[in-house]
Amino acid sequence: MTRNQKWTIASTAAGFSLENMDIMFLSFALTPIIASLHISQGAAGLIGTMTNLGMLFGGAIFGLLGDKIGRIKTFSYTIFIFAFATGAMFFAHSLPVIYALRFLAGIGAGGEYGVGMALIAENFETKQVGRMTSVAAIGGQVGAILAALAASFIIPHFGWNALFLLGIVPVILTYFVRRHLTESQEFLTAKEDAQKNHRKISFTRLFATPRLTFQTLGLMVMTIVQIAGYFGLMNWLPSIVQKQQGLSVSKSSIWMIATIIGMSLGMVVFGYIMDKFSAKAAFSIFLIGSACVLFIILAAHTALTMILAGMLIGFFSNGMFGGYGAVISRLYPTEIRSTANNLIMNVGRAIGGFSSFIIGILMQSFNLKVTMMFLSGLYLVSFIVMQLLPGFRQLKNVPTAKVEPE
């Protein structure tokens, strides 16, 4: 790898790691927040939803900025914003303040994804992008493991507020990003070409033709399902484990680490299948696998079987996360790549984020089996949509889209 490639993958992996650490802080703090503020499960679920709404807003703004002013500047801005909002949670002692800060954190985190994926796509060969986006996504899982370890120590001794102080660490990353990363020649050429031919960078480019509109909306449905499954499971699985097995926060953190390891292994396998065979093959295997393995948790009644169930669920449900950035980056032109990645993924985050609220209601009104049936059905819907998208059938032989489809 070249020096810039090394810094690209290191910076994006670190950025996703710190972003995921912030998201998982909420997962582990959710039960203590409910207890300390005396709120319902539905109100607590809305905390995660506010984060995802912020991601939609931030993704829209920073996606456009990433295509207009450059990936590097935009990437550093997004990291700084979510770091500030996360650290400020230390001073939050009421639900409205928590909602506001999580929305602000979402703005920064939402902007980061598309810019990071664009950086990877523009600095590596097409045949490497699936694996490289998976490596960056694995960085996110490292952040989740660090969050689990931190939560197991900090929450019992210092309370949930103190956990969020670690959120200021990403500020350090912005220095290294601005100092060591440089824009790719592919981006600079595409930007110059767009300016020369007076092509505007706007959301309407994603809906320029009927086929492109169908592709964009279909990918949005898939990301909605991905985020609904991930946030729904990650925000509530620790609580489910604590309730079903009577585990403490510390022990449930160990269980979560096993789940996250499963996710990381899934990302490695997914990236390999995608680059070796095709995006369609990789997504087909993992979407069907996700729909099936969710029910394993119903039969898990010991610590060991819960760990194995968690690893399998993590392997399939989040193994494909990095694949979305790789697919979107190859289906849309370089000059709107950041916009496409951020808008599509963050529409998924905004709508899929409501799964935290919906699952809270399902858990309160029904049982775990109904909740798993709901999530399993979503994965099957995503599988059907993926089969209908013509872009997936062509993806193996089309390195990068240079023009919008007719």
Language-model features, listed with the residues they occupy:
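Extracytoplasmic gate region of multi-pass secondary transporters
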Residues: 27, 210-267
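Interfacial helix-cap and linker-helix signal at transmembrane-aqueous boundaries
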Residues: 33-34, 65-66, 150-156, 241-242, ...
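Helix-breaking motifs and short loop linkers at transmembrane-helix boundaries and internal kinks
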Residues: 38, 70, 91-97, 125, ...
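Conserved MFS/SLC helix-loop-helix module at the cytosolic interface between two early adjacent transmembrane helices
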Residues: 57-93
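Cytoplasmic helix-loop-helix junction between adjacent transmembrane helices
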Residues: 101-138
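Helix-loop-helix hairpin linking two adjacent transmembrane segments in secondary transporters
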Residues: 136-179
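C-terminal transmembrane helical hairpin of 12-TM major facilitator-type secondary transporters
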Residues: 274-324
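A late C-terminal transmembrane helix in Major Facilitator Superfamily
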Residues: 331-365
